[in-house]
Amino acid sequence: NEENCIKLFNKHKKIDLLINNAGFGLFGEFSKTNLDKELNMIDLNVKAVHILTKLYLKEMIKKDSGRILNVASTASFLPGPLMSTYYSTKSYVYELTTAIFEELRRIRSNVKVSVLCPGPVNTNFNNVAGVNFAIKGLSSDYVTSYALDKMFKNKLVIIPGFTNKLAKIACKFASLRLLLKVD
C-alpha cells in the first residue's frame, strides 16, 4: 500500500538502483474474477511501481545519477483476454517507463530508466495466477543476467529471449482482432 511504499522510501532514500519487480496475475473472465484480488493486483503492479518510481526518481534527478528498472511483461503489448487486469497493469508499467525515459532525455539527465518485458519465466507466478503457458518459460537466472546487462548498456526496452522479441514484432503488425484471440 501507499503507506508501506513511503516507509520503504524514507528508510532507504539513498540508493543508486531501484528494481520494481513485484507483481502477480489472476486468470479468468473479467466479469467473474474476484474484485478484491484485482484491486490488490492494481495496488501492487501499478500503484507501488508508480509511487516508488516517483519518489526515487526525484532523489536521483537531484543527484543526476541512478537507475530504475521497472518490470513489465510481454503482456504489456497484448490485450490479454482471461488475464485482462494483469495485462493492463503491465501496459501501464511499460508506458509509464517509456514516458519517463523521454522526460529524462529532454532534461539531459544522467538518470537512466529501463523496462524489462519478459515472457513466461520459471517462477511461482503460474501457480499464483492459476495459469499454464503454452511456451516454456525462461530461467530466472537468464532473465536476470540479461536484464542487468542491457540495463547497464542503457537499453530502454529489454526483451529477453528470441521468441519474446519475435512476439513483440508480430504484435506491431497483427490486427487487434487477431491479438484478441491470443491466449
Please tell me what each predicted stretch does.
Residues 73:
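Residue(s) in the substrate-gating loop at a strand-loop-helix junction
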Residues 80-84:
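Active-site loop immediately N-terminal to the catalytic Tyr-X3-Lys motif
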